[in-house]
């Protein structure tokens, strides 16, 4: 049903401690599914050296194309001590991305400044590119990431009426630095907002970007596919 819906390739992104095997199983079962391995900041306090070793080991798999979803989330985590643990684990996973020559996928919520500072520091030391997943900050912050040659992940939120900030960012950002994503099962685009999300909803996202940029949805789909393939080293 993915092919019929125009979806050629999917990157399934790990997030939780204990969730790696699900991604590995999907990658092995479906030729069109690739993986990203990493731990979301919500689980940073559950991470051990074994977790990091496992991320590194799985990153060697042929179809594992990125380290993610990694980053900082201060929305639910208000304590400075929690922030320190998140930053430590974020850096540890960026180290793996650098050493294994893989791009990263970043989650950042209510942590704009700290995320930007850490990413900037790593990019200056040389990295293999990355995606700021589900980008939600201002155009000014987008500009900083775009200057570093990073990509912005755009999902269902761009179709929401109240997503003024994101729409401005999408108008401003070059199409050559955007990729499409779902954040499944969350963030379903209009007209399916509130329902379980799936990759089959991506045409709505492409259409919204096309309208904001005054181009066709076909062009959005074509260019964002090429962007993702180039960054992630996935070839036809």
Task: Tell what function each PLM region has.
Residues 1-236:
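Mid-domain alpha/beta scaffold segments of enzyme catalytic cores
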């Amino acid at each position: 049903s993915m092919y019929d819906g125009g979806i050629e390739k999917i990157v399934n992104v790990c997030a939780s401690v204990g969730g790696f095997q699900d991604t590995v199983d999907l990658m092995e079962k479906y030729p069109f599914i690739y993986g990203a391995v990493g731990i979301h900041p919500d689980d940073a306090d559950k991470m051990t050296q074994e977790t990091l070793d496992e991320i590194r080991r799985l990153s060697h798999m042929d179809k594992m194309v990125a380290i993610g979803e990694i980053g900082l989330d201060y929305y639910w985590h208000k304590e400075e001590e929690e922030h320190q643990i998140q930053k430590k684990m974020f850096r540890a996973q960026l180290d793996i991305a650098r050493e294994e020559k893989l791009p990263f996928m970043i989650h950042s919520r209510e942590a704009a400044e700290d995320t930007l500072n850490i990413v900037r520091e790593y990019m200056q030391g040389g990295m293999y590119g990355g995606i700021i997943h589900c980008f939600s900050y201002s155009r000014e912050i987008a500009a900083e990431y775009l200057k570093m040659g990073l990509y912005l992940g755009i999902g269902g939120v761009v179709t929401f009426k109240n997503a003024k900030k994101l729409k401005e960012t999408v108008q401003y950002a070059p199409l050559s630095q955007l990729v499409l994503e779902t954040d499944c099962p969350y963030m379903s685009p209009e007209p399916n907002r509130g329902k379980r999300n799936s990759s089959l909803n991506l045409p709505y996202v492409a259409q919204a970007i096309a309208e904001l940029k005054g181009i066709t949805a076909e062009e959005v789909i074509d260019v964002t596919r090429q962007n993702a393939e180039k960054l992630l080293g996935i070839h036809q």
